[in-house]
Structures are given as C-alpha cells and as structure tokens.
Design a protein with these regions (language model features):
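P-loop NTPase motor core
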Residues: 1, 38-101
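Walker A/P-loop-proximal flanking segment of P-loop NTPase domains
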Residues: 1-38, 46-56
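Asp/Glu-centered strand-loop micro-motifs enriched in Gly/Pro and often flanked by an aromatic residue
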Residues: 1-20, 74-79, 122-126, 130, ...
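The start of beta-strands in P-loop NTPase/AAA+ ATPase cores
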Residues: 14, 65-67, 146-147
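Short secondary-structure boundary/capping segments
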Residues: 35, 85-88, 162-169
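Flexible beta-alpha connector loops of hexameric P-loop NTPases
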Residues: 76, 120-124, 161-169
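Mid-core helix/loop region of P-loop NTP-binding domains shared across ATPases and GTPases
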Residues: 98-149
Length: 170
C-alpha cells in the first residue's frame, strides 16, 4: 500500500500528532517523512526509496526543504526514572551532535564561545534541553528550517506513570 500520498495532507497542517495503536507503522512513517523532507537526502537516495510511488511522481514543494532532527524516545524508556532521565539526556545530546555533523554546524562545550556565535551548537552533557535550544538557534541563525520528529514521545511517560519496565515495546 502506497501511503506516500498522505504527505501532501501533512503539509496542509503545521503540526501533526499520530496517535495510533501499537504496530500501526508510526515509526516507519516518521522515517519516511524524515527522508522525504531532509535536505541531506540525495536525488539518488530519493529515487531509490520513493521511485514508483505517488510522491515520486508528484512531489510536493517542501520535498528536501528541511534540516531534520529525528528523536526516538523509545531508546530512553528503560530502567528507573533516574536511568531514563540520563538516557533521554544522552539520546537528545547524541542526536543533536549527529545533526551538527550532518549539516556542518560547529559544536562547542565552551559557554562563552557559544554565547558569541549564534550558529554554534553548545553541547551541555547534563542539559539536553539547552543543547536542543542552541541547535534551534543555530538553525534559525543560518536561515534554515528545522523539521523536528519525535517518535515514541509517550514511551517515557508511560513507563514513568505505570512505574514498570515492561511497557509494550511496540
């Protein structure tokens, strides 16, 4: 089934939130969207992945338009709340660092340097939200646009609320 035709519908709304039961392909859809909208996806990759599909025949104006940050919170949903906080911080920081490398941003752990260069991503190993904030500032300073995808956004909360580690992994 070719579901790429729905990409056009996504572009008509500024924010999307997919709330389907487990095993409905939400993670696959986030990967499709990340690849479709990513500036870093080459024409060859695009043709290989989307060739013959509706979206390849009729691409939208925003294809390849964004710098994409794709966060998957399922990687941080294990262990105690303290363990999950540490894993979530590490995951967000790792993805921000990978984003910086992918799109050619400079990264620094020097707060003074980061404060004077808006195009620099400041890496704070203990404060992923600050790292993420400086990533957003750097993207904006370059005149780029960010497409943020958060997969399994509820996994962390479900584990914390249910106070157990055996939450369905799908």
């Amino acid at each position: 089934v070719d579901n790429t035709k729905y990409i056009r519908e996504f572009e008509e709304t500024p924010f999307q939130c997919f709330t389907r039961p487990p095993r409905w392909g939400k993670s696959l859809l986030t990967q499709i969207l990340a690849t479709y909208y990513d500036k870093a996806t080459t024409s060859e990759q695009y043709g290989t992945l989307f060739g013959g599909l509706d979206i390849h025949k009729n691409p939208t104006k925003l294809r390849g338009h964004f710098q994409v940050l794709n966060l998957d919170f399922s990687k941080a949903a294990t262990g105690s709340v303290e363990d999950m906080n540490a894993l979530l911080t590490e995951h967000i920081n790792d993805e921000c660092l990978a984003f910086g490398g992918k799109y050619g941003y400079n990264i620094s752990t020097d707060m003074i340097e980061a404060a004077t260069d808006p195009e620099l991503i400041y890496h704070d190993e203990n404060d992923a939200m600050f790292t993420l904030k400086t990533l957003g500032t750097a993207v904006h300073a370059r005149g780029e646009e960010l497409y943020l995808i958060v997969d399994e956004y509820d996994r962390y909360a479900n584990v914390c609320l249910l106070d157990r580690e055996d939450v369905d992994q799908d």
